[in-house]
């Protein structure tokens, strides 16, 4: 069975991860997740202070070529070794994450629709669309609680890079989406539609015809 590859994009704090977690809870072992954040480029030659000043919301921040190769390998039925990114040190670690091919692969991240070669590997493209005020509040809570950031650093990053990069790259990529989901995982109607499509694929092995 060729995997069903679903891209889930949207701005920071939009609810992408909540949607992914809801789908994983629904289908368990039949779903694997390939997060865009794992593919932040390595900067071992920089100090922590230098890495903290980088723009992590620009397409150049990601090792997209490696992500494309890993997704192609998964699509071909091969197991891949995904990089692992550590938010505390703002760098890729030496560890890798083993990801085996699966019936469904969820590709999740803010910029996964920006690159044509990457989005062309996806059978279904979903954009999670959430109000900017809600997104920034969620980002503050996440980065302070889960990633050890200060409120001041989160706000500075949002104003200097996150917001302008969202307007330049993330929001325009919405036009490539097959489905736009307001409020992410909290949109139960959209969630059930996606669940039904995945369930059909798992049962019948049917995927969208290749272009």
What is each PLM-predicted segment?
Residues 11:
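P-loop (Walker A) phosphate-binding loop of NTP-binding proteins
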Residues 16:
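Conserved lysine of the Walker
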Residues 19:
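Hydrophobic positions on the alpha1 helix immediately C-terminal to the Walker A/P-loop
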Residues 25-34:
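Post-Walker A helix-loop "phosphate-sensing" segment adjacent to the P-loop in P-loop NTPases
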Residues 32-33, 45-89:
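Conserved nucleotide-sensing/catalytic segment adjacent to the nucleotide-binding pocket
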Residues 70-105, 199, 205-206:
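Phosphate-binding/switch loop-helix module in NTP-utilizing enzymes
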Residues 93-147:
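ATP-dependent NMP and nucleoside kinases share a basic, alpha-helical "lid"
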Residues 100-101, 141, 163-211:
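NTP-dependent small-molecule kinase module
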């Amino acid at each position: 069975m060729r995997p069903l590859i679903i891209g889930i994009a949207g701005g920071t704090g939009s609810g992408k991860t909540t949607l992914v977690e809801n789908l994983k809870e629904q289908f368990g072992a039949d779903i694997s997740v390939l997060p865009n954040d794992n593919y932040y480029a390595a900067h071992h030659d920089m100090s922590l202070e230098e890495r903290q000043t980088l723009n992590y919301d620009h397409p150049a921040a990601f090792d997209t070529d490696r992500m494309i190769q890993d997704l192609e390998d998964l699509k071909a039925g091969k197991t891949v070794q995904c990089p692992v990114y550590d938010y505390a040190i703002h760098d890729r670690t030496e560890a890798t994450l083993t990801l085996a091919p699966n019936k469904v692969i969820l590709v999740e991240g803010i910029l996964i629709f920006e690159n044509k070669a990457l989005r062309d590997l996806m059978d279904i493209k979903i954009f999670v669309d959430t109000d900017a005020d809600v997104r920034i509040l969620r980002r503050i809570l996440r980065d302070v609680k889960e990633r050890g950031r200060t409120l001041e650093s989160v706000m500075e990053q949002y104003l200097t890079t996150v917001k302008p990069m969202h307007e330049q790259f993330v929001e325009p990529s919405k036009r490539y989406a097959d489905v736009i989901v307001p409020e992410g995982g909290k949109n139960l109607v959209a969630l059930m539609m996606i669940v039904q499509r995945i369930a059909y694929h798992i049962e019948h092995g049917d995927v969208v015809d290749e272009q």
